UniProtKB/Swiss-Prot annotation:
Belongs to the TFIIA subunit 2 family. GO terms for cellular component: transcription factor TFIIA complex. It comes from the Eukaryota. Keywords: Nucleus, Transcription, Transcription regulation. The gene is TOA2. This is Transcription initiation factor IIA subunit 2. CDD domains: TFIIA_gamma_C (cd10014), TFIIA_gamma_N (cd10145). It comes from Cryptococcus neoformans var. neoformans serotype D (strain JEC21 / ATCC MYA-565). TFIIA is a heterodimer composed of the large TOA1 and the small TOA2 subunits.
Amino acid sequence: MSAGQTYYEFYRGSSIGTALTDALDELITQGDIPPQLAMRVLQQFDKSLTECLQKGVKNKTTIKGHLSTYRLCDDVWTFVVKDPQFKMEGVGAGSEMVTGSKIKIVACKSGDAADGKKAGGARE
């Protein structure tokens, strides 16, 4: 990890993040790894998943729904959308529509924007 660069930890709450955390907890409990190593693994997970999503996701998704709640706290936006409809383009041949009852979207500043640099397409 680059010095001074921090990554958000909210991907640890995903299914793969939870599985990793459970596996690391088991290894610590069995005495196979020290807790410091587990923390380094989780920090690398945060970094790797963030970079993978930034560089690897090229599909476009449009979300429509009813905005139920929104909040800004410490430069983190949280939106709760009821009855969302996701239209995903570039998935197979054409586009795919997925619906749900409620979603929570958490939006954070990118690394460039957090450092005060202008992010691609963002206005200050």
